[in-house]
Curated annotation (Swiss-Prot):
GO terms of molecular function: imidazoleglycerol-phosphate dehydratase activity
The organism's taxonomic lineage, starting at the top: Bacteria, Bacillati, Bacillota, Bacilli, Lactobacillales
Family to which this protein belongs: Belongs to the imidazoleglycerol-phosphate dehydratase family.
SUPFAM superfamilies linked to this entry: Ribosomal protein S5 domain 2-like (SSF54211)
Organism: Streptococcus sanguinis (strain SK36)
PROSITE patterns for the chain: IGP_DEHYDRATASE_1, IGP_DEHYDRATASE_2
Pathway field: Amino-acid biosynthesis; L-histidine biosynthesis; L-histidine from 5-phospho-alpha-D-ribose 1-diphosphate: step 6/9
Known EC number: 4.2.1.19
Class in the EC hierarchy, top level: lyase
Protein name: Imidazoleglycerol-phosphate dehydratase
Catalytic activity: D-erythro-1-(imidazol-4-yl)glycerol 3-phosphate = 3-(imidazol-4-yl)-2-oxopropyl phosphate + H2O
Length: 194
């Protein structure tokens, strides 16, 4: 079973997170940051994974530590659940429209961490979520999952739609990448290792 559970406690956050790559329930997100909960729920649904998150953070400061640390723990849990990555597609790409917005995510579960992020948000906050944290979350996720992740808003105006498009596209690209392909024997790399 491709699953993992991680608990991480620091001076700033206390996080319990569990993933299962081969089942879609439960999905239960509690971070104290409403918009972020909404985005993580979308991410889980579109990647078709089970994801539970309980996070307590220093929200009296702002939501930065909570969002970034959830990205760290989610990346670590996904990496652990993937194991040696034998048989997976490895690559995934998705374009997701959201009304006037079109977002793209393309990723490689290569073991090499990199993020290319091309998105601007006119609205600095969505609820108690600072829109600059979209990039911070994906940076933490990419570096801890050890994936190469390219995110881009091709066009759009609404900040909510832009963020939602990127979270959905990343979820859908991840589903493609983590899917076990019967035509792939061993690891999908000429190196024999990811």
């Amino acid at each position: 079973m491709r699953q993992a559970e991680i608990k991480r406690k620091t001076q700033e956050t206390d996080i319990e997170l569990a993933v299962n790559l081969d089942q879609q329930e439960p999905v239960a997100i509690e971070t104290g940051v409403g918009f972020f909960d909404h985005m993580l729920t979308l991410f889980a649904r579109h990647s078709r994974i089970s994801l539970t998150v309980k996070a307590e953070g220093d929200l009296w400061v702002d939501s930065h530590h909570t969002v970034e640390d959830v990205g760290i723990v989610l990346g670590q849990a996904l990496r652990q659940a993937l194991g040696d990555k034998a048989g997976i597609n490895r690559y995934g790409t998705s374009f997701v429209p959201m009304d006037e917005t079109l977002g793209m995510a393309s990723l490689d579960l290569s073991g090499r961490s990199y993020l290319v992020f091309e998105a601007d948000f006119d609205n600095p906050k969505l609820g108690n979520f600072e829109t600059e944290l979209v990039e911070e979350f994906f940076q933490a996720l990419a570096f801890n999952l050890q994936m190469n992740l390219h995110l881009k808003i091709l066009h759009g105006k609404n900040s909510h739609h832009k963020a939602e498009s990127l979270f959905k596209a990343t979820g859908r690209a991840l589903r493609e990448a983590i899917t076990i392909n019967p035509e792939i024997h061993g690891v999908n790399s000429t190196k024999g290792l990811l």
